[in-house]
Amino acid sequence: VLSTKELPPTPEGLVELERKKREEGPFGFVKDIGVAIVEMPRGLKKMALVYLFQWYAMNVFWQYLGLMCAVTYFGVNLSDPGYAKTEAFNDASGFATGLMVAYYVSCTVVALYLARLANRIGPKHVHTAALCLAAVCLVLLTRIGSPGHTAVLYLPMIGIGVAWASITGVPYIMAIEMIRKERRGVYMGVINMM
């Protein structure tokens, strides 16, 4: 932000924007979004499908991490009506919070370097590797620890954090390469809706 030079619109560009606003009315942006979705480049349509699955997977992960830890590593029995009030469940919840800290820290650190890596080897390769890493780490999360040895679970959480850094940034790098310069704004909004 500090090193990016702002390019203000030209007077002619401002006149054109005002004309377009008058012609399209207050809801012209809805038409613009609809046209963008219909005319979406094939690569972005493929990305939309990937987004569907990655966001679903991450939502399931966020919702069930604590329960998975409770059942798999802390011996909580979900059929017990008072399981949420047990000490084991509280311990599992605290442990899951610690895992999420590792996830967020790794995501933050990796995000600082991911764009450079994507520029060097290509965003498609970086994102594919990150999603594969996430898949492996999600499986490992339920397989590599044991009730007495839960510290090893921080390793897959770091991998999932790496994937999250990619999920929240690299698709925009890929998209910018597919979109005409004058349509970038609307398509960035469409990607945010995915």
Where are the regions that the model predicts?
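Intracellular juxtamembrane helix-capping segments at the cytosolic ends
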Residues: S166-R180
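C-terminal ends and interior cores of transmembrane alpha-helices
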Residues: C132-P147
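Loop-to-transmembrane helix entry/capping segments in MFS-fold secondary transporters
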Residues: S93, I179-I191
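Loop-to-transmembrane helix entry
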Residues: G75-V105, V152
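Intracellular loop-helix junctions on the cytosolic face of multi-pass helical membrane proteins
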Residues: V1-V60
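Helix-to-loop junctions at the C-terminal end of transmembrane segments
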Residues: V109-P123
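Hydrophobic core of transmembrane alpha-helices in multi-pass small-molecule transporters
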Residues: T150-S166
